Amino acid sequence: MNIFDILRDYLLVQVDKYNLNMDMISIVSKSLSSKEAIGNTKRKDFPIIVGKEIMLEADFKGAKGQAFTSTPSTFEGSLKDILSLDLHDNPHDRSLFIASLNAVMKYLGKTDRTIHCKNNEPEVCAKKFPEFIKMEFGNPKVAIIGYQPAIIDNIKDFFETRVLDLNPEFVDTIQYNVKIEDGIRDYEDVISWADLVICTGSTLCNNSIINFLSLNKPVYYYG
């Protein structure tokens, strides 16, 4: 079963369990500016700042959830509308669904951290990665999936590091003394090389997450 079918079925179960009337609940989703999404960061090369990604934010009864997309939009509809989106062939619909799912789960108290960290928080988070990795895995070779500059810069000084990304403007460039490799062309080589994979949650929205769910090595998702 497709992962989005699993997620949709899960949301349906929660709607029934908590008696959420699908026709009466409104979800408002809008695209955020980079300042709204990530604030004033030390680094200015985050994909959302340079215009390579767009943040969707869903608001469900005051609870907010976010997801990345490549297409700006506004949307207002019910949970019934969200559950009817095309999650197989439409990347924008997938992002809208994930943002909405995050908002609903936040509202129900089933998760937290459903919005992106802002201002100096990406740096604070990234600085914790090396200690965590060393404590859990010793001295592994690390594959980072997705261009996240703070994480790359903090990990590469402590561990052998390779980075995969799908954006052609990043691929084959050197960033923070690390070559950014092609997420399709170099996938097999990088994944077979790595002992540990640090993977962006954006892989769920673009459906490339299927390439990382069944790996015979530890995979940690961020964002």
Where are these regions (language model features)?
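Electropositive, gly/pro-rich neighborhoods at or near active sites that engage anionic ligands
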Residues: 1-149
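Short beta-strand/turn micro-motifs composed of small residues
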Residues: 146, 165, 223
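Accessory, usually C-terminal, subdomains that scaffold auxiliary metal cofactors
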Residues: 177-223
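Residues at the starts of beta-strands that form the adenosine-phosphate
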Residues: 141, 160-162, 218
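Glycine-rich phosphate-binding "P-loop"
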Residues: 111-122, 171-178, 195
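Histidine/lysine/aspartate-rich catalytic loop segments that bind and position anionic ligands
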Residues: 150-181, 185
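Flexible, charged surface loops at secondary-structure boundaries
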Residues: 49-51, 133-139, 156-157, 189-195, ...
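Gly/Ser/Thr-rich loops at beta-strand to alpha-helix junctions
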Residues: 147-151, 202-205
